Amino acid sequence: MSIENSKEAALTAELSLAGAFFYTPECPDIEHLRSLSVANRWLDTDLPISDDLKDVAKLTPAEREFYRFLFAFLSAADDLVNLNLGDLSALFTQKDILHYYIEQESIEVTHSRVYSAIQLMLFGNDAAARARYVASIIGDAAIGRKVAWLQAKVRECGSVAEKYILMILIEGLFFASSFASIAYLRTHNLFVVTCQSNDLISRDEAIHTRASCCIYNNYLGGFEKPEPKRIYELFSEAVNIECEFLLSHAPQYSHLLDIGAIISYVRYSADRLLGEIGLSPLFNAPKPSPSFPLAFMTVEKHTNFFERRSTAYSGTLINDL
């Protein structure tokens, strides 16, 4: 190596080392999503969940059991996602990605607190009754199947890229039927504040899903990506698990829900996610009708949902759930 080349290599190494101690823009797409998430910050204290207590009595016993089940799962699911985030963020040196994950973990804490408050409200603020229910439902087969499937697939992961496919499935599919089921309450003017929180959380998860897709597409160059056959296999299994999860506790006779429409939405969501990572659709599910509560969910500006506090939401990100 010539003296000139040696000096250039030394300078490059020096600059690289120095770059570890200050922020340099490297990932414009991820930085955009981080900035969007910051602009959309909200707090669990923004939402007076107790205002919805009056609507609990308006549910049938089967409907009440169904929503208690959903929120028991959702309360636990955010902890599962946070555990995975801590593992994934250590893979990157780009500060844009590290900063994004810090922001995501922060909002997941808000989600967890809101879910806990809604869950307690569904038990008439009886903490002991809630605790007994959670202790009995935590071993439910439908929840257990989701967790067992995810744990098994993490153990089987042949690459970091495949783990990102799992993150896309967690964030984009494993909440889809729950979000849709909660959104149906809005169509009957029930649980207004709970539906408000569902709007905000589902939009946050849209950002998280988009970020996972961006990282998978653009920042895993050093990792071998799974074959399309493997990705389709994972998507197919995840959709089946999500649909069975819904059917396992959905009330058989309820005017609140359209179970068929929710299942179609889950499949449509899977096809959209496949498109985000450059693959053809698997289910060819139709786009939800305009009457579907989540059909036009976007991360766009909405102010004063119920005239208590401005909860303006910025951006134009399409929901990838």
Swiss-Prot record:
It is a single-pass membrane protein. Fe cation 1 binds at residues 78, 108, 111. One of its GO terms (biological process) is release from viral latency. It catalyses: a 2'-deoxyribonucleoside 5'-diphosphate + [thioredoxin]-disulfide + H2O = a ribonucleoside 5'-diphosphate + [thioredoxin]-dithiol. One of its GO terms (cellular component) is host cell membrane. Its main location: host cell. GO terms for molecular function: metal ion binding; ribonucleoside-diphosphate reductase activity, thioredoxin disulfide as acceptor. InterPro entries: Ferritin-like_SF, HSV_RIR2, RNR-like, RNR_small, RNR_small_AS, RNR_small_fam. Its cofactor is Fe cation. Fe cation 2 binds at residues 108, 171, 205, 208. Keywords: DNA replication, Host membrane, Iron, Membrane, Metal-binding, Oxidoreductase, Transmembrane, Transmembrane helix, Viral latency, Viral reactivation from latency. The chain crosses the membrane at residues 165-185. Its EC number is 1.17.4.1. SUPFAM superfamilies: Ferritin-like. Heterotetramer composed of a homodimer of the large subunit (R1) and a homodimer of the small subunit (R2). Larger multisubunit protein complex are also active, composed of (R1)n(R2)n. Belongs to the ribonucleoside diphosphate reductase small chain family. PANTHER family: RIBONUCLEOSIDE-DIPHOSPHATE REDUCTASE SMALL CHAIN, RIBONUCLEOSIDE-DIPHOSPHATE REDUCTASE SUBUNIT M2. This is Ribonucleoside-diphosphate reductase small subunit. It comes from Equine herpesvirus 1 (strain Ab4p) (EHV-1). The lineage of its organism: Viruses, Duplodnaviria, Heunggongvirae, Peploviricota, Herviviricetes.
